[in-house]
Amino acid sequence: MKKLENEPFAAKYCSNAISLKRSGSSIERISNTLYSSKITMTPHQIDAALFAFKSPTRKGVILADEVGLGKTIEAGIIIAQTWFEKRGKVIIVAPASLMKQWQSELSEKFNLESVILDRKYYNSYAKRGYINPINLIESNIIIVSYQMCSALKDEIRNCRFDLAIIDEAHKLRNVYNEKSITSNNVKYALQSFKKVLLTATPIQNNLLDLYGICSVIDEDIFGDINVFKYNYIKNYDENIEELEHRLKSVMHRTLRSQVQQYIKFTNRIPKTFYFEQNDIETAVYESIRKLLLDSGENSYLIPKSQKHLIVLILCKLMGSSMRAIIYTLKNMRNRLIETKQTGIIEEINLEDYEIDDEEYVESSIIETSAKIDQNQINREIETLTSIIELAESVNEESKYSALLQSLKYSFAHLKKIGAEEKVLIFTESKRTQEFLSERLKRDGYEKVILYNGSNNDANSKEIYNEWIMNHPASSVISKNINMKSAIIDKFRKDGQILIATEAGAEGLNLQFCSLVINYDLPWNPQRVEQRIGRCHRFGQKHDVVVINFINSTNVVEQRIYELLNSKFRLFNEILGSSDTVLGGLEDGKDLERSIVDIYSTCRTNEEINNAFDALQDKYKDNITESIQRTKEELMSNFEEDVQQYFTDILTSAQLCIDETERLLWRLLQSVYGPLIPYDDENFVFEIDGKKYRLSSKNCDNFYESFSLNSKLGERIVEIANSYKYQYGHVVFNISDYKYRLSRIDKLLGKHGYMVLHKVSIDSFEKEEHLVFNAILDDGTRIDQEVCEMLFRLKTTEYITSPFTDSTVRPLLEDSKINIKNVINQSEEKNNKFLSEEIERLNLWADDKIQSVQLEVEQMRIQRKELQQQSDLVSNSIEKENIENQIIKLSKKIKLSWLELADAEEEVENQRKQMISNIRKVNSRESRVEMIFLVSFEIA
């Protein structure tokens, strides 16, 4: 025997055990993903993620947890697991305003990099002549907006994605209507991919919403729309149990009431500060309003390509700060001066205002004019100059004075409730951000930190450099992520006020801050919800105060706040705007456009009020009492007593994570042996001059994180799998193990033989199993669990020659029996999948037949009505026309009955063919590989 320096047999076991491909919805399947992620485990999120893996024959699922329960995290687990299992490609379709948040969440919580595919990114490839640039994107995860997915439907359809995530999937609920162009294009683009739909509102207006959303996953779930209407709308009460049964196979829903044991929900407390503009501020406001109202088609003031966007920005800046207004107006004036000199009409520089909604961003357009009207352009330059001079004469801004009052209230309130004295201020303008920072520092608030999309100011760079010095391992992570971490860390430890812009704050998790100030208020309700959600989220210990400012001299601003507060209920619900309210909003930008129209067309307060009255009526709660009852009745059927179930999930998940951690640490030691220094207490080690720590213990990112998905983790698995040793002798050193293993203690001094096989099964899914068999010299069998426990111990290992057949024959015979049992268990599980799929196909066949029957029945009713009509008609010509219609209809009915028999036969043939195809997929292939066969002793 030759003694080995390391532990290759232990390494081979650990690397195989930690990398096993698992099928179905066992927690073991996602244990590596849970271990490697940076999420706070909640049982309902684990349960939802496992639901997506429950049946390999399904084409997708709907995750319909109530709002605020973390559907993004659930999807993140599914995405990470898809990547882990097969380096799969994933496409995420989300509202444009949520794309960056998705990118941030995947990066920070799952260490997954992604690409946002917007028009600019796509065109950069398309202009170089590439036919389908999507195929060239190196990232495995692509994020697109609904609009972009619709526009690129053919390109996306022709790509190969292993998974499609659709966020806010209720936007597709009208897909059965041909007029819903975007919905149908998205459905077409993603048709062949496995899908996970995320929505808190699977039913919004009526039960057809369910039909539409389910059809995005699979058109055969409910079949014909007329059958759905007949069974589940017209005869709802009789068929509710059947509808519930069908839904439970495809939809998973958790209610807030079910998770209160695990998640503490805090309240939102709205606080409003009113202020009055002074005369000069009012004059500036009215001058800009007049400028917008008077700028016609022939004006040079606003480029046609930016018309909507510039009006939107100017209207919003009127509620922000004078500095932001002055900066934008000067940009507009400089552009006019350049146009006057060159005759070229270029777009306005909008760098101050963070625009990330792609449909507002046009490609750069340069217009040329045959002749510039010098008089008109001079008048417009003079008008801008006069407004700029007026704005520059404002010494003290009334809104800023209100901010000072609010801060005085804020810090007193935070001190009173025992919360950390920290305030988050939001603005949509970088210039307003700079203005607030300067003025607040002047007025005694020294601990002010800025965060925006660039953070290239001196103070931010200083914060970043200081943070990097204390977190050297983070130098390998992207600068944007590190900057975000540095700002959060500084704000948590030393900051008092964080002033953030819209785009910069996406993905910020500030649970330690419980006071949010909207210095200027977005008109998009979803944007407001995202702002407040930075603080009002899981982990928040206090009620969150949300402060808004209202200009009591400005009717438009008052009505905007009224709309957001009363109609969308953003500021005072436990989890913010309810799923019913925001779920019914097709797109927050449609509200923005409506408000821009009011600014652009209404001149008097009466006109403004009338327009807002109409707008409020448009967004009134259109959920009827009847549909609300149906929603509650149907969705409540998903609510069960799940407390013990959730407790069991959490316990099982923690056990799986602990086992993953143990295997990973043992794998590391068995590969490197005494070659590297270890700290077993803190799970720290050093390789090639770098210090690493198990990722589950690396909370402060001071060390490089070590997980199976890290580069080092992949390298170690590769080394372990490269060991060619199959035969040897292993000494398990129980005396070196610091914990007591009672089942192992009994084996001290025993000798025997052990074999490890890997069984690979390829059926609906690929799955792998490790099968241990061990026999002591006295003939005692050792079970799988004890064999696994033995490899927790450090070993001394030797290479030997193969063993004689007579020595290991009983061991190998036992092994054959156990391997056969594993294959049989897999077959039973897959037969269950097969039965479920056959049941679904039978329901589909019934729907098809019923569709023809309903059509015939409808014609019979129509014929009866015509016969009654004929009896009442006295005019012979009219009577003859009706009788001809009856004859035609009777022939059609007779023909339909004949066709029904053919249809039944055709459907039955289709059903048999589909079942045959499923059976072919289920025809399993299995492969058995011996990992090692060793003699052993326990010392």
Predicted features and spans:
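SF2 helicase/translocase NTPase motor core
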Residues: M1-L50, K54, K71-T72, W83-T182, ...
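C-terminal accessory region of SF2 helicases/translocases
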Residues: L4-A11, H542-E704, N709, G713
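Walker A/P-loop
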Residues: R58-I78
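Inter-lobe coupling linker of SF2 helicases/translocases
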Residues: I131, I137-E138, I142-F161, Y176-F193, ...
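Conserved Helicase C-terminal RecA-like lobe
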Residues: F265-Q277, I313-L317, I326-G495, Q643-R693
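P-loop NTPase motor cores of the ASCE clade
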Residues: I337, I365-T368, Q628, Q643-D847, ...
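Amphipathic alpha-helical coiled-coil segments
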Residues: K888-E908
